[in-house]
Design a protein with these regions (language model features):
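N-terminal secretory signal peptides
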Residues: 1-29
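Glycine-rich loop/linker segments at domain edges
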Residues: 2-12, 121-142, 194-238, 335-371, ...
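N-terminal export signals
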Residues: 20, 27, 33-54
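Conserved beta-alpha junction segments in alpha/beta enzyme cores
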Residues: 55-96, 100, 233, 347-400, ...
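Short beta-strand elements
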Residues: 70-74, 233, 371-375, 468-477, ...
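Thiamine diphosphate
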Residues: 94-99, 394, 413, 417-440, ...
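C-terminal catalytic domains of large/alpha subunits in multi-subunit enzymes
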Residues: 102-133, 160-187, 261, 269, ...
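N-terminal amphipathic, basic-rich helices that act as targeting or association modules
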Residues: 153-155, 159-307, 630-637, 642-665, ...
């Protein structure tokens, strides 16, 4: 998601956003307040100190994100609480980061727990400078940070023990939550924490040799698994405050439309309804919020509203018309992301002409969007599963007319997100603030939870964009590509955002073209068109690779099939010696699957794909068939190269989850469509996500490595659909050029 954004660009982009006059927009932010640094020395014992109170005590040379006090709490009983600087929404980051810190701390893992950090600057991503979760960067960007935090905390505990026993710290060692000294002396971390927290924080610390790891690299159960499996884990949707009310919002059927007339008499008559409020929405639209005692009366009242919408001033997209426009646009000249000589196309012995269509897709997290806002005399408090609590908190301050430091963010566990919980405009958070503000103006002095239904979520916009690809490829009898003329048409997800001026170059959004450049050495001319469409779009799990990987990996199979080459051998030849991680992942998947060594049951075929995204490589070898005219995925064998596997069990889960989401893209009904400007889907009855009955058998294998870990939240998604499609094409002889699959 954020892998194309350079670390130097993100603070500049946010500074640009924050420098605007607050009167210009409700999302205006103030840079000085938002980026205020806070720090503290020592280990926190009991409750965390407020970081800003000890800012002047921070050791020179250490940022707040490098000091253990914000991240490690050791209770007298030895329980270690690790604060994570990311949102946990199913990817296992709470466990992974806690493992990394606990490894260097030599903590007793049975006494380790993890909690979310706040929007404070101490919890900023060490690369990007703000608190965010995205781009599969969590473990990748914080691996060294959390190792050093654990090592600093351990060094302080050793110093505390050395002072207590009046010995040199070099004579001491640690083991599972204890400091061990000469003569059999020992002290638990809980006994030493109070003294350790008063000591200076060491700037330079020695880290373990990876060969000495006892926790990192070990398949470990997640810290939150027990509560989740027993229904005890609370999510943002579960927040309950004294006197809390619930709001639902009636939004226009066409994006950007405004309210023309309203009859709310029937809605107000429903028992439990407290207010019906007209509020501003994202993209200049208007909506109507119903505030009530609970969700059911609020929903009943919303259903009872009689609303008329003015759609005269907004464009009304239509899926069929859009696709025709995209096809016309693909014929036009446009900016080039890559260039090459296309003259060999005219005389190429073999050619392929292909068009691919990828629909709009909803994120559809299991927990719909929600945000609880409490307005207080001191400012405001928000409870929300935010991927960027610093940005969302500052945006909330702008909407409420407060200073950023007057807004307190309580980051909640989230039930999935896939990119939807990080919007550069903080749209759903600002909406909740507008509801709370309007409720206060109506005389309501209570916390208000704004809750989206599944229908609100599916129809609410911010989709993966519709994309059209066209490719004309010339190649010889050996499969050597002589020329590849490629056109991509699709909305830019960064256009109109704070990131546009930094990450859209020459009219080309880099997130749209990722996956078309590497790893294969191809003479490609790539033309890109980004049309303006009245559909809000956003990054979606694995971003551009959701469509580019499919195009590249299915076309490579087409070339291999046309030249009678084994698709694995063909890929290996193209990869050469320049991409050893791709080769290792692909070979591992091939070896573990039995590809080419054992016969498949009648009616089944192999499919292969390999793709790098977010600095990790995933290769799939799949078994598939066609039953009653429908494609069936039976088995998936994965080869994964993500460098050091911090928690192999979590990586296995991420690969499986991403693959199932990739499978969803292939299934009939997995598309958002428009007619006269309105979204035609509303729930899982007409918007398909894979069910348990669709899921294949999985085997996930990881290439051993001691190099620093790379991202794993998203890389398992892109190669699944092309591997599946390649297997079906082996059976039918016909390539699949459109998602979801159509075998008619």
């Amino acid at each position: 998601m954020l892998h194309h954004i350079q670390p130097a660009d993100l603070p500049r982009a946010l500074a640009h956003l924050m420098a605007r006059d607050p009167a210009e927009t409700p999302t205006a932010l103030r840079r000085r307040s938002f980026l205020k640094l806070a720090g503290a020395s020592g280990l926190a014992l009991g409750a965390f100190p407020h970081l800003a109170l000890a800012q002047d005590k921070a050791p020179e040379g250490l940022k707040p994100s490098q000091q253990p006090s914000a991240f490690v709490r050791i209770a007298p009983n030895g329980e270690v609480t690790v604060t994570v600087n990311r949102l946990e929404f199913g990817q296992g980051v709470m466990t992974g980061l806690a493992m990394i810190l606990a490894e260097e701390l030599d903590a007793d893992w049975t006494k380790v727990r993890a909690v979310h950090g706040t929007g404070d600057a101490a919890y900023a991503d060490p690369q990007f400078g703000i608190h965010l979760t995205g781009g599969s960067n969590s473990i990748k960007n914080s691996y060294t940070q959390y190792r050093e935090l654990g090592a600093r905390a351990r060094a302080m505990l050793l110093s505390a023990a050395a002072a207590r026993w009046k010995v040199d710290a070099a004579q001491l060692r640690t083991r599972t939550g204890q400091v061990l000294g000469p003569g059999g002396r020992k002290a638990s971390y809980g006994e030493l924490a109070e003294a350790a927290m008063r000591l200076p924080v060491p700037i330079t610390v020695a880290l373990k040799d990876p060969k000495d790891f006892s926790l990192i690299g070990k398949a470990t159960s997640r810290l939150d698994a027990r509560d989740k499996s027993r229904g005890r884990q609370a999510f943002g949707i579960d927040v309950r405050l004294p006197g809390q009310l619930t709001a639902v919002v009636a939004r226009p059927p066409v994006f950007g439309a405004r309210l023309a007339a309203m009859d709310d008499s029937a809605a107000r008559a429903i028992k439990g309804v407290k207010a019906v409020l007209r509020i501003p929405l994202d993209r200049g639209a208007e909506g109507v919020a119903v505030v009530a005692d609970g969700y059911w009366p609020a929903k009943q009242a919303r259903d009872a509203l009689k609303l008329q919408w003015d759609t005269s001033k907004v464009d009304k997209p239509d899926s069929e018309r859009l696709l025709a426009q995209y096809r016309d646009l693909a014929q036009q000249p446009g900016p080039r992301a890559m260039d090459a000589d296309m003259a060999p196309l005219a005389s190429a012995p073999h050619t392929i002409d292909a068009e691919f269509v990828f629909p709009f897709l909803a994120h559809a997290p299991m927990e719909p969007l929600n945000c609880t806002v409490s307005l207080t005399p001191a400012g405001a408090e928000l409870w929300v599963g935010s991927q960027s609590p610093g940005l969302d908190g500052a945006a909330a301050a702008g909407a409420l007319g407060l200073k950023p430091e007057q807004v307190k963010m309580h980051v909640q566990m989230a039930g999935g997100g896939f990119g939807r919980r990080f919007v550069s405009t903080s749209e759903y958070v600002i909406e909740a603030c507008e509801v709370a503000k309007a409720a206060r103006a109506a005389g309501i002095n209570a916390p208000v939870r704004t809750l989206w239904s599944r229908e609100d979520d599916i129809k609410g916009g911010y989709y993966r964009p519709l994309h059209l690809h066209r490719a004309r490829i010339g190649f010889d009898a050996n499969g050597n590509v002589l020329a590849w003329d490629h056109v991509l048409v699709g909305q830019s997800i960064l256009a109109g955002s704070v990131f546009e001026q930094y990450q859209v170059k020459n009219g080309i959004d880099a997130t749209a073209t990722e996956g078309l450049r590497e790893p294969y050495p191809l003479p490609m001319r790539l033309t890109v068109h980004h049309p303006k469409v009245n559909v809000p779009v956003l990054w979606w799990r694995s971003v551009g690779s959701t469509h580019t990987a499919y195009v590249m990996e299915t076309l490579l199979d087409d070339i291999a099939r046309a030249t009678k080459q084994d698709p694995v051998a063909y890929r290996m030849r193209l990869l050469g010696d320049q991409h050893p991680r791709h080769r290792a992942a692909l070979q591992l998947a091939v070896d573990k699957s039995g590809y080419g060594k054992q016969p498949l049951p009648a009616g089944r075929a192999w499919g292969v794909a390999v793709h790098e995204s977010f600095s990790s490589v995933v290769a799939y070898v799949v078994e598939a068939s066609v039953k009653d005219g429908n494609p069936v995925l039976h088995r998936v064998t994965a080869g994964v190269h993500c460098n050091l596997a911090v928690n192999p069990r979590s990586i296995e889960a991420q690969v499986q989850g991403a693959a199932v989401m990739g499978l969803s893209m292939c299934l009939p009904g997995s598309a958002i469509t428009f007619k006269n400007g309105e979204v035609q889907q509303s729930n899982f009855g007409d918007y398909t996500v894979a069910r348990m009955t669709d899921a294949p058998a999985f085997a996930v294998h990881i290439v051993p490595s001691a190099d620093a870990p790379t991202g794993m939240g998203e890389p398992g998604l892109p190669p699944l659909a092309p591997a599946f499609a390649n297997a079906i094409a082996q059976l039918t002889g016909k390539p699949l050029r459109e998602l979801p699959f159509k075998l008619g």
